[in-house]
Structure formats: structure tokens, C-alpha cells
Amino acid sequence: MFVHCTSNSDDRQVMQFIGDEMEKRGYNSLYGAADHIIFKNKKAISILDGHEGEIDFIFRFTPLEWLKDIKPKTWDGYFDTITPSCNHPVAIFAQTKRFPLIWESLKKNGIKLDTWEKLLPHTILVKDLKDKEGYIYKPACGRVGEKISIKEACDEEEYNLILKDVKRHPNDYLAQEKFISMPILSPNKEEYHVCIGSYTVEGKHAGFYARISKKPRIDSHALDLPVIIERG
């Protein structure tokens, strides 16, 4: 089943394209939301009308930060199902901003985190921020730059709303030491802040993607860019 946000037409277009290609190769494609699957004996079962029964494979396109908010909590079966899954939700361990909070425990168990510690800004619980300066708030499971309190990247109304939400729901946020983003100059002499990410398949690098913004925050208003590598 191609699991996606069924109310979003752009998500459905992506799923439909991949599903059509799978159909050409002899597979049957089902399209549903995350709660259209239940789990029995750790096997994924479709509850779609007319398509009830065990399914052979899960392709998850629904973002984890949305999946976790589904009620009732039927989504936990995605984590330990024996049904083969693409885009496995175990990846949330590195997606959540809470990851640094378990580093000490991981290091005690022999896991090396030298690169993480070198590159990731210092991260603490909101309650531990107190009078420390130079920190910003980030949602623990945020996406596309939403609710990140970089003051110069927010208008006054948005900034104040973020601070109010942090006070109401401190456990939904982390405090992270702010770093200064250095913009690059475009050919038309405009400054842009750049974020480059890496695609992986089976834990191996499979390509880059990039987004740029005139503000020092990569959010839903940022532009997508291809990444072209020139080999000498």
C-alpha cells in the first residue's frame, strides 16, 4: 500500500505515478492513509473498503511528524511490523530534535558520535534554558522550518506566537544554540541562505537536494534547487 496524506492532491499525484509504474511491472497498487492499515501479529492489514486483507509491502509517504499525531494510536505498528516497509519510521530517531538528549547513554554503550557532536549545535530541554543566551526554539518534530524562533527570519506576530506556544507546550520544543548562517551571492548579486541535504537508500548516500531562502531560515517559502556536481 502507498501510504500518504489522502487529502493532499500533490501527495496523491506522486503516489499515483509510482503506483502506475508498479502496475506496469505486475504489482497491484493500493492507495490509503496511515490509518487505513491495522496490524495483527505484526502483519499489516488493509481495512480499505473492497480491499480488506493482508498486504505485502508498505510504501510510506506520510511524514512522521504527522503520523505520530494520529488518534487513536494505531500507528505504532509501523515500527515493528514484519511486513516489508520502504521509508521505515525508525528514522525518527535521527529526525527528532531530541536525539542529542540520549547521546550520553549511547556513548556509554560504545556508539561513537564524534561527527554529530562536532556539527550539531548544543541542544537542551526548554526547562533547562533558564537565563542562557544565544539559543532559539525548535519543535522536537518540526518540518520545513515551521515554528523555529529565528527572530530576524520571523515577523513580529509569528515570533510572538512561537514564544506563546513554547510556554503552553514546552515539551514539544527543544532549545538549540543558534548558529550564524552565511549567505552566498547569486549571479544577479542577491544573497541567499542555502541548505543541502542528502538522500539515502539502505543507509547509503544516493544524491543531494538543496533549498534556498533570502531569510536565514529554510521554511515553506524556500525555493527548491537541483544540485549539480562538477567533476574535475
What are these regions (language model features)?
Residues 1-232:
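Domain-scale recognition of functional cores that engage charged ligands
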